[in-house]
């Protein structure tokens, strides 16, 4: 089994290194090949997603991704900025389903920004559609306004759109995920304002007929944002579009105490996937050895479960992380009184020891 390892920028190389150590400690034979991506790709090849990196990603059975982005690239034209690498990989590999779990471990309830009783036992899965919506809809750009109150003025415009096949496939993925969990699915939309999401709602309702054992509910995105803070444990699986999912999954991340704890998976129709932590490249702490590697290590566990069919090994890693937390090891982002503060490498070593 071949794994493409794409560390990226900022803290990416540090946290990916710890996940690779954990994978190497398993009783499995993985072929792991590393390639530059993001700012590192731009420095090496003049493009955030070099041809050889894309070729490797296409050939691999799964991709372990770090993070991309750095302020020093903000002056580049948009097509050359590091963040275009992840968008390019999603597009070329047809990664349409993003899984973002938000789990609050018992030991970390004190690190959450909410009261412990609101988040204790929290286990949400957000299923986000990745290939459509306003992020990719055409046409888009800057032009002279052709009509309206400010006709002739410069305006920016984007297009929100979803096709029926796009909605159906993400709905099926979400219903199947809910069927394996608490059998509750909440579809988040803005059907009261947007035609696109009235259409979304209609299609999701139609797909629901194939899953009679799953309870389907609907919620407007503004209310969903409020309920995630007010009563987060009322959710099990949430399915939504690209932009809403982008925002809600980051909000849900902070319910858990730190975005540094949350893995994610982006899958194609055959469960080949790209696995990455939910956080960014954090260039302000890069090289300091203080970043939390647990989200990346847990992303490696998701990779084993969804793309490599190694569920038992995934369980081993997840249980090792739970053990390390129970032992009181904490990086700075999840530190609470009475716990032992460690750095990136020490946290990785603790997980290895727990394995």
UniProtKB/Swiss-Prot annotation:
Pathway(s) the chain acts in: Amino-acid biosynthesis; L-leucine biosynthesis; L-leucine from 3-methyl-2-oxobutanoate: step 3/4
EC class of the enzyme, as a word: oxidoreductase
Co-factor: note: Binds 1 Mg(2+) or Mn(2+) ion per subunit.
A GO term, aspect molecular function: NAD binding
GO cellular-component term (any): cytosol
The entry's keywords: Amino-acid biosynthesis, Branched-chain amino acid biosynthesis, Cytoplasm, Leucine biosynthesis, Magnesium, Manganese, Metal-binding, NAD, Oxidoreductase
Residues reported to bind NAD(+): 280-292
Major localization class: cytoplasm
Compartment list: Cytoplasm
UniProt-listed InterPro entries: IsoCit/isopropylmalate_DH_CS, IsoPropMal-DH-like_dom, Isopropylmalate_DH
The keyword Calcium is annotated on this UniProt entry: no
Example GO BP: L-leucine biosynthetic process
Protein residues bound to substrate: 90, 100, 128, 222
Binding site for Mg(2+): 222, 246, 250
Record-annotated site: Important for catalysis: 135, 190
EC number: 1.1.1.85
Reaction catalyzed: (2R,3S)-3-isopropylmalate + NAD(+) = 4-methyl-2-oxopentanoate + CO2 + NADH
UniProt cofactor(s): Mg(2+); Mn(2+)
Keyword flag Nucleotide-binding: no
Family assignment from sequence similarity: Belongs to the isocitrate and isopropylmalate dehydrogenases family. LeuB type 1 subfamily.
Quaternary structure and partners: Homodimer.
NCBIfam families: leuB
Function of the molecule: Catalyzes the oxidation of 3-carboxy-2-hydroxy-4-methylpentanoate (3-isopropylmalate) to 3-carboxy-4-methyl-2-oxopentanoate. The product decarboxylates to 4-methyl-2 oxopentanoate.
Protein name: 3-isopropylmalate dehydrogenase
